[in-house]
Design a protein with these regions (language model features):
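Surface-exposed, charge/polar-rich loops and edge strands
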Residues: 1-325
């Protein structure tokens, strides 16, 4: 399987850099796997595609401010993980200003580079907790071409976000309002989205790609609901990867579990749990493009993307969505 097989050309003006005024006003392309039919609908039509005994599974992770700008200026800290309130694992730039034992300040807190990891990440120890509400920013995807605004605090967060820990939003969930959610039989899993979600696959052969690892949790009530459901509709690639990862370790069944997963789903993968998927439009050559191709077939996905471009759909995190049935 070649990475180049998942490429497409997107006119830059179709990248949605701002959300629509209303969450649920997005367009929704419906892709039928069996017939190859492609329909153009709106997200408000989503409930009409549910059958009796269907279960909608969503990711209830909450995006945390992960981008910090030290008082010294000209530097940026991207927190990948808060190991404790006083110890962070970070990516930083420029690296030369963050050598071992170097210090910097975030408000009243002093950070010290305590370890430089092999991959260039840093462990930083603080003398007191950082005031995240004041100094933290949302790490919006680079393709939005802008810094975060106050409105993103609400809109780059799902209405059902509960468990803090993501750097990026599980974007398929952004379309839901409480009113839509109330109409649907649903359950939650948690997967904390890491920075790896945006990284393109840089190797020529897909199987050589090393997948990033992300923390997840499946509660008992969700496991029971999934196993009793007729068809599971995953909202987003993150919910998909969580369910499939747990099923892979448990002979096809979903059980209550927590841990880390680096599951990489690409064409040839046999889905054990997920029967339908609501997802946004993804970056070329990304692992997410490969995941949707595993479910619907690469040719049908590329055809659907070409049609989305022709019909001027809005792409990526703040963009429109696709329902694969």
């Amino acid at each position: 399987v070649r990475t180049a097989d998942f490429d497409y050309q997107l006119p830059p003006e179709l990248i949605a850099s701002e959300p629509l005024p209303q969450r649920s006003a997005s367009r929704m392309m419906v892709v039928h796997r069996d017939s190859g039919l492609i329909e153009h609908r709106h997200f408000s039509d989503f409930p009409s595609y549910l059958r009796p005994q269907d279960l909608v599974v969503l990711n209830d992770t909450r995006v945390v401010p992960a981008r910090f700008f030290p008082d010294e200026g000209g530097r940026e800290v991207l927190r990948l993980e808060a190991i404790s309130p006083l110890r962070w694992r970070c990516m930083i730039k420029p690296g030369k200003k963050f050598r071992l034992h170097q210090q910097f300040h975030l408000g009243g807190a002093t950070g010290t580079v305590s370890e430089v990891l092999e991959n260039g990440e840093r462990l930083i120890d603080f003398d007191q907790p950082v005031d995240e509400a004041t100094y933290g920013h949302l790490a919006l995807p680079h393709y939005m071409g802008r810094d975060d605004q106050p409105s993103d605090t609400e809109r780059y967060q799902t209405v059902f976000a509960r468990e803090e820990g993501s750097i990026a939003a599980p974007t398929a969930g952004l379309h839901f309002t409480p009113e839509v959610l109330d109409q649907l039989p649903h359950a939650f899993v948690t997967l904390h989205v890491g920075v790896g979600t945006f990284q393109p696959v840089k190797v020529e052969n897909v199987t050589d790609h090393v997948m990033h690892s992300e923390r997840y949790e499946v509660p008992q009530e969700t496991a029971s609901a999934v196993n009793a459901a007729g068809r599971v509709i995953a909202v987003g690639t993150t919910a998909t990867r969580t369910l499939e990862s747990v099923a892979q370790s448990n002979a096809g069944r979903v059980v209550a579990a927590r841990g880390s997963t680096d599951i990489f789903i690409y064409p040839g993968y046999q889905f054990q749990v997920v029967g339908a998927l609501l997802t946004n439009f993804h970056l070329p050559k990304s692992t997410l493009m490969m995941l949707v191709s595993a479910l619907a077939g690469r040719d049908l996905i590329l055809k659907a993307y070409a049609e989305a471009i022709a019909q001027r759909y809005r792409f990526y995190s703040y963009g429109d969505c696709m329902l694969i049935v």
